Amino acid sequence: MKPDYKLVAKAKYIHTTADLASEIWHEVYKRYYPGKQLDTLVEELQSAEAIEADIDNDVNYFLVVLGGKNIGYFAWKMENTALHLMHLYLKPEYRGKAIGRDIVLSCERLARGEGKGRMWCTVHAKALPVQQFFKALRYRNLKPAEQENGTVPRNELVFEHTL
């Protein structure tokens, strides 16, 4: 069964996405950040208010729905020459089932259709399985990411794929 992607626009879905983000981020990032720092990261970057501000800045959030259950979410922003994949998170039991790959490939098709020449994202420097995921999709590690916002330092790398 293939998942559906539901555009997050209404307040109800923004709050659903924020709750899902908090759940997944606390599972994914607990090995990289102490508890209070992680809580601050989630609040600054994935609270309902932060998601709403992103949406107001032309970021498109989507819930990933499979069999009526929210199993993850992703977000992207179209830039001048590229599509920036800002978030791609799935619940642990849905990883390794080609769902993330299909999301990345559909974003690449969208970017190509909009005449963009590349797609990029950031990955935590210690998240080796995620780096391998993007390398398998022909993304290359360009450089350390510059931190644009937030008070908690994030050790991230830029991965890019030329379309």
What label would you give each PLM region?
Residues 101:
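Residues forming the Rossmann-fold NAD(P)(H) cofactor-binding site
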Residues 130:
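Helix-turn-helix
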